[in-house]
């Protein structure tokens, strides 16, 4: 049986969690939280990182930072994403404006996003998909030209680069996920990167339940008080300790995943006239090899191959169900054909297994089998 995902483990997690028991501080914002934040800051070359209990929480902090209560505000984002991307802003009262995807990348199309900017637009959320980038530098130029903010949903992109810049550090804000389905994880955790300095203090207040606690701890304020509408957004020290062990194993994790990804890529790239898409390796981007996917010629072919792979005890999954045609999206006034490309291509994409317990040869076998099944479908 080839599972779609198996959570990564380093064998150091239990030791670090045992150390939390020795230190006797469990609730969060302690030794291991700071250690994780320092590691992330050094790894991606930024100053301002807040460890969160999820990527969803990181997005929710951004939404609270940008919300002008009482004003009509819009946020542009792709429909092809996880629900949290939209829900974080919808909960804060933003009007959600869904944009089309580029079918070749399955990421937000810059021309369509540009066409939807209005005087009420506060920002654009780009979602980096599968360990590949959504051309953040071009979106940064677009946002700068229109005096709006760029938010990177980099849930799947920790360790990825666009040129020499880490994804998640190019916009005003970057949001990472350390959910157990990601390359590195704490079961459930995340991080917020604040690249726009004017939001650093407020972000810290929101992260600290809306209080100035961090300023009091640093001796910058003498009274502990409520200064902002915030929430409970940081993880426990148990989660942070688990994540610390994972982060320290970044290089090993990266090299293993690259080898497995290469097994898929070598087979698909070596076959011609396939009639479907798969991830493109580009000199402009460096991947973290989070996922390998195939976009087939039609939904029927995709379903046929997914079900046939099950017969070989191989678990493969479809991508996201588009948000604009979901129950909530329909309630917002959207119809499925409002974003025809998103609706069409979301039914044609299949993610193949990729986790550190696989081998390069296993990926090659699955790739060869996928091509064989595609030919079988077309006969």
Specify the residue positions occupied by each region the protein language model found.
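N-terminal "arm"/small-domain region of PLP-dependent enzymes with the aminotransferase-like
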Residues: 1-26, 225-227, 353
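Phosphate-binding glycine-rich loop
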Residues: 29-74, 88-90, 98-100, 165
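Hydrophobic/aromatic ligand-binding patch that stacks against planar heteroaromatic rings
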Residues: 87-89, 142, 238
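Active-site phosphate-binding strand-loop segment of PLP-dependent enzymes
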Residues: 104-186, 191-198, 351
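PLP-dependent aminotransferase class I/II
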Residues: 34-39, 43-50, 111, 123-127, ...
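Conserved PLP-anchoring active-site segment centered on the Schiff-base-forming lysine
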Residues: 62-115, 123
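Helix C-cap/helix->beta junction micro-motif
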Residues: 92, 145-146, 312, 377
């Amino acid at each position: 049986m080839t599972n779609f995902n198996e959570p990564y483990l380093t064998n150091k997690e239990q030791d670090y969690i045992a150390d939390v028991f020795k230190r006797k501080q469990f609730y969060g914002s302690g030794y291991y939280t700071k250690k994780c934040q320092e590691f992330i800051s050094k790894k991606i070359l930024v100053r301002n990182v807040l460890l969160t209990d999820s990527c969803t929480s990181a997005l929710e902090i951004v939404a609270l930072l940008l919300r002008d209560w009482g004003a009509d505000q819009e946020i542009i984002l792709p429909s092809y994403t996880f629900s949290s991307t939209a829900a974080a802003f919808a909960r804060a009262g933003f009007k959600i404006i869904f944009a089309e995807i580029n079918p070749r990348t399955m990421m937000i199309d810059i021309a369509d996003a540009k066409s939807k900017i209005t005087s009420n637009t506060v920002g654009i959320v780009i979602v980096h998909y599968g360990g590949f980038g959504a051309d953040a530098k071009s979106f940064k130029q677009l946002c700068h030209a229109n005096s709006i903010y760029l938010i990177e949903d980099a849930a799947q992109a920790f360790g990825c680069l666009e040129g020499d810049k880490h994804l998640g550090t190019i916009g005003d804000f970057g949001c990472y996920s350390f959910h157990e389905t990601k390359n590195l994880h704490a079961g459930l955790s995340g991080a917020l990167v604040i690249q726009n300095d004017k939001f650093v203090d407020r972000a810290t207040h929101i992260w600290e339940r809306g209080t100035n606690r961090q300023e009091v701890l640093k001796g910058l304020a003498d009274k502990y008080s409520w200064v902002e509408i915030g929430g409970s957004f940081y993880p426990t020290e148990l989660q942070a300790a688990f994540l610390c062990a994972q982060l320290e194993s970044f290089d090993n994790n990266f090299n293993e995943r690259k080898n497995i990804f290469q097994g898929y890529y070598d087979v698909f790239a070596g076959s011609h006239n396939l009639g479907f898409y798969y991830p493109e390796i580009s000199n402009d981007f460096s991947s973290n090899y989070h996922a390998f996917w195939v976009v087939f010629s039609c939904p029927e072919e995709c379903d046929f191959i997914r079900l046939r792979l099950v017969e070989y005890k191989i678990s493969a999954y479809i991508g996201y169900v588009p948000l604009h045609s979901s129950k909530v999206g329909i309630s917002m006034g959207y119809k499925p054909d409002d974003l025809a490309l998103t609706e069409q291509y979301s039914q044609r994409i299949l993610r193949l297994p990729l986790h550190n317990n696989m081998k390069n040869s296993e990926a090659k076998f699955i790739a060869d089998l996928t091509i064989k099944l595609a030919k079988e479908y077309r006969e």
